[in-house]
């Protein structure tokens, strides 16, 4: 099985290839340079893996949430590549991707993901890894004010890992929440961590045709555009 993963939904730009169990990955912090970097990174990963695009079984893309511009860039480029090679596509949540990263780095199976969404809000989710290694919690994804996060936390108990830029942007996000929190060691999503999720989705037949690949913004785009200078 070969899966190519692409993510440009945040300040990071990353590409990874699952090549029959071997992973090759590249991750860069490159704000506002996604369009210049992503295709060269794809070419570098394919060359390093000795694979061509026509040998890929599916193309995974970071479907958001994240920067509107970044999410659109990633999906547009992924669609172009998938169309040219006639590949099925797999949308992967940026929040679930970070949860997978926390598991890879720390073994965490319960993860609170928060991405700074600007405008006084965070993109939020509570993910838990089940016995089959599948992340459950997509229904918890939302864009929330910090005080609403506090309300969500009061409904939880036990130990959780924290991931994402939302925690540094809002240091008091979990103030007096009563939970045991530890650092999941992930600030931004990486394509490498999309691959296990994408492989599960591919095995389950959860792919979409190129024309049906859609972003998940969690926020109304019109409301975002009312603020000048924001992506």
Swiss-Prot record:
GO biological process, one term: tRNA threonylcarbamoyladenosine modification
Compartment(s) of residence: Cytoplasm
Entry keywords, A to Z: Cytoplasm, tRNA processing
Regions annotated as coiled coil: none
Chief localisation class: cytoplasm
Pfam family, one: TsaD
Record GO cellular component, one term: cytosol
Function in brief: Required for the formation of a threonylcarbamoyl group on adenosine at position 37 (t(6)A37) in tRNAs that read codons beginning with adenine. Is involved in the transfer of the threonylcarbamoyl moiety of threonylcarbamoyl-AMP (TC-AMP) to the N6 group of A37, together with TsaD and TsaE; this reaction does not require ATP in vitro. TsaB seems to play an indirect role in the t(6)A biosynthesis pathway, possibly in regulating the core enzymatic function of TsaD. Neither binds polyphosphates nor a wide range of nucleotides on its own. Does not show O-sialoglycoprotein endopeptidase activity.
Full protein name: tRNA threonylcarbamoyladenosine biosynthesis protein TsaB
Biological source species: Salmonella typhimurium (strain LT2 / SGSC1412 / ATCC 700720)
């Amino acid at each position: 099985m070969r899966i190519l993963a692409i993510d440009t939904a945040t300040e990071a730009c990353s590409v990874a290839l699952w090549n029959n169990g071997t992973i090759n990955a590249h991750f860069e912090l490159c704000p506002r340079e996604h369009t210049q970097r992503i295709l060269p990174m794809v070419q570098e990963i394919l060359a390093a893996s000795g694979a061509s695009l026509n040998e890929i079984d599916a193309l995974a893309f970071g479907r958001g949430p994240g920067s509107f511009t970044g999410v659109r860039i990633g999906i547009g480029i992924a669609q172009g590549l998938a169309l040219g090679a006639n590949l099925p596509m797999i949308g992967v949540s940026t929040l679930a991707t970070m949860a997978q990263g926390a598991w890879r780095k720390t073994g965490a199976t319960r993860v609170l993901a928060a991405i700074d969404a600007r405008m006084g809000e965070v993109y939020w989710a509570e993910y838990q890894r089940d016995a089959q290694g599948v992340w459950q919690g997509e229904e918890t994804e939302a864009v929330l004010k910090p005080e609403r996060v506090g309300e969500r936390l009061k409904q939880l108990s036990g130990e959780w890992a924290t991931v994402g830029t939302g925690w540094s942007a809002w240091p008091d996000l979990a103030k007096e929440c009563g939970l045991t929190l530890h650092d999941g060691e992930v600030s931004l999503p990486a394509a490498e961590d999309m691959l296990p999720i994408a492989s599960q989705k591919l095995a389950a037949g959860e792919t979409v045709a190129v024309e049906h690949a859609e972003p998940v913004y969690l926020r109304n785009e019109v409301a975002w555009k009312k603020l000048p200078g924001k992506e």
